[in-house]
């Protein structure tokens, strides 16, 4: 059985037409605003409905629409003082007018509430990624998924595609599987964050618009001239802004499609010479980075501009074709004025860009970003014994690691886990709750400085292991 207001072939838009009879005052166009100011407290006050409209019988005349409280032709309810003041300007010409509210007037929530069966919770929000709306529909709404998607497209002209997440994330690249519910099939899109432009294939790479605030919080800690190591870089939400503010960035991701878009985004944002991209397992990436012979193996991103705005045969919309600018989890364009955007762009252009070719990562880097909450803690073990004190110069790096925390866990539990993987204690960790991702689950970030004790602990462990083995061998020889 179809839900009210919809049918197997789509939405019955005529079911949403509402006609409201209203009393109106007919006056000449040039005097309409003067009279309206006198009667303002009595006029129609509805969202997105004008209280001054053109007279359909005479374009030179206007109708002042009264509120529902003024329902009689004698304008009962309007003070005598106001009526006399109006008569001094224009003669009273009271008429009837019908306000028509059709499908286009009603917001998404109202339409869906009318369409969906009683008891169904109306989807109240969705994530927007460029021209794509990302839904997470519960099972009881899946029967109506196509209708829901159609309404969202109708009501958001900047959107072109609506998708729904299917199942849980099981692939090695942590990319959700999506079903396209309505609109264009292409998931290649473009978004803007903090003055940077990002292109991506939403069906092939990971992106979360709700993390915009966290991206800003972290890269605000980077200073011009610093060297950043991003172990799980994705398409560059940390790497690109860091390079824009004068950092050199070593960026790695296991997903080859993410790395391709990372390189493309480096070129789009003119920071290619400041970023070196790798497509490796994160542990292998870190070990290569601190080996002098291997530290230059990655590709400088500026050499990878993809011809004709295409990637793997998929056409990528240009910034002019798709210029949706996002706020965190929002589907609204940026409210910044052109002058503000130009000023911000000029400020970015003034920053002296670091050339990655001038950096020796085996000697120093300042920050390590580990943004893979599902398993980043496990990768902390690569830092155990990683750095060579004979070659390292300057201060030890700060590690920014993301993870999940269950409701029955504490910050101390997370730090203890981290210490287990690191192989040593963490002094003064800075723990920060990023956001709640589920009723009993939160995303957490902690920052700590790697100590030389941790850097050397693996070497000392190996040293003592060899001593013990040598002792056992000698002991066995003595007893022969």
Swiss-Prot record:
It comes from the Eukaryota. The keyword Nucleus applies. Residues 334-346 have a biased composition (Basic and acidic residues). It catalyses: guanosine(37) in tRNA + S-adenosyl-L-methionine = N(1)-methylguanosine(37) in tRNA + S-adenosyl-L-homocysteine + H(+). GO terms for cellular component: cytoplasm; mitochondrial matrix; nucleus. Keywords: Cytoplasm, Methyltransferase, Mitochondrion, Nucleus, S-adenosyl-L-methionine, Transferase, tRNA processing. It holds the Pfam family TRM5-TYW2_MTfase. Transmembrane segments: none annotated. One of its GO terms (molecular function) is tRNA methyltransferase activity. Residues 312-346 are annotated as: Disordered. It is found in: Mitochondrion matrix; Nucleus; Cytoplasm. S-adenosyl-L-methionine binds at residues 215, 253-254, 281-282, 371. Its EC number is 2.1.1.228. Residues 312-328 have a biased composition (Polar residues). Gene3D superfamilies: Met-10+ protein-like domains, Vaccinia Virus protein VP39. It is an enzyme of class 2 (transferase). Specifically methylates the N1 position of guanosine-37 in various cytoplasmic and mitochondrial tRNAs. Methylation is not dependent on the nature of the nucleoside 5' of the target nucleoside. This is the first step in the biosynthesis of wybutosine (yW), a modified base adjacent to the anticodon of tRNAs and required for accurate decoding. Belongs to the class I-like SAM-binding methyltransferase superfamily. TRM5/TYW2 family. Monomer. This is tRNA (guanine(37)-N(1))-methyltransferase. It comes from Physcomitrium patens (Spreading-leaved earth moss).
């Amino acid at each position: 059985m179809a839900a009210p207001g919809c049918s197997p072939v789509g939405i019955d838009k005529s079911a949403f037409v509402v006609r409201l009879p209203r009393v109106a005052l007919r006056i000449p166009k040039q005097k309409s605003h003067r009279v309206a100011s006198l009667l303002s407290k009595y006029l129609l006050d509805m969202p997105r409905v004008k209280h001054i409209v053109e007279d359909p019988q005479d374009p030179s005349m206007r109708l002042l629409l009264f509120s529902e409280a003024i329902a009689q032709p004698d304008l009962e309810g309007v003070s005598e003082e106001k009526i006399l003041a109006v008569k001094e300007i224009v003669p009273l010409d009271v008429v009837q007018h019908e306000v028509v509210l059709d499908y286009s007037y009603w917001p998404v929530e109202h339409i869906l509430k009318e369409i969906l069966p009683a008891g169904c919770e109306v989807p109240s929000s969705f994530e927007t990624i460029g021209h794509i709306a990302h839904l997470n529909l519960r099972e009881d709404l899946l029967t109506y998924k196509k209708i829901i998607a159609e309404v969202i497209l109708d009501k958001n002209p900047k959107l072109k595609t609506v998708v729904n997440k299917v199942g849980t994330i099981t692939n090695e690249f942590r990319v959700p599987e999506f079903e396209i519910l309505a609109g264009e099939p292409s998931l290649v899109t473009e978004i803007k964050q903090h003055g940077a432009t990002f292109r991506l294939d939403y069906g092939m790479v990971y992106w979360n618009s709700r993390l915009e605030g966290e991206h800003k919080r972290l890269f605000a800690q980077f200073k011009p001239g610093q060297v950043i190591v991003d172990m799980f870089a994705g398409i560059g939400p940390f790497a690109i802004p860091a390079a824009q503010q004068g950092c050199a960035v070593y960026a790695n991701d296991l997903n080859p499609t993410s790395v391709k878009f990372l390189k493309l985004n480096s070129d789009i944002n003119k920071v290619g010479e400041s970023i070196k991209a790798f497509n490796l397992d994160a542990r292998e990436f870190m070990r290569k980075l601190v080996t002098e012979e291997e530290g230059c193996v990655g590709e400088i991103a500026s050499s990878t501009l993809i011809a004709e705005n295409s990637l793997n045969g998929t056409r990528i919309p240009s910034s002019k074709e798709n210029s949706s600018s996002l706020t965190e989890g929002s589907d609204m364009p940026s409210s910044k004025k052109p002058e503000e955007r130009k000023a911000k762009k000029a400020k970015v252009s003034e920053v002296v860009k670091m050339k990655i070719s001038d950096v020796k990562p085996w000697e120093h880097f300042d920050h390590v970003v580990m943004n893979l909450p599902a398993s980043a803690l496990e990768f902390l073990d690569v830092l155990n014994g990683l750095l060579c004190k004979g070659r390292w110069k300057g201060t030890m790096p700060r590690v920014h690691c993301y993870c999940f925390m269950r409701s029955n866990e504490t910050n101390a539990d997370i730090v203890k886990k981290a210490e287990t993987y690191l192989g040593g204690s963490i002094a003064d960790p800075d723990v920060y709750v990023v956001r709640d991702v589920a009723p009993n689950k939160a995303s957490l970030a902690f920052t700590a400085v790697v100590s030389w004790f941790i850097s050397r602990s693996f070497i000392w462990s190996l040293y003592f292991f060899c001593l013990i083995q040598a002792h056992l061998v000698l002991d066995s020889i003595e007893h022969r």
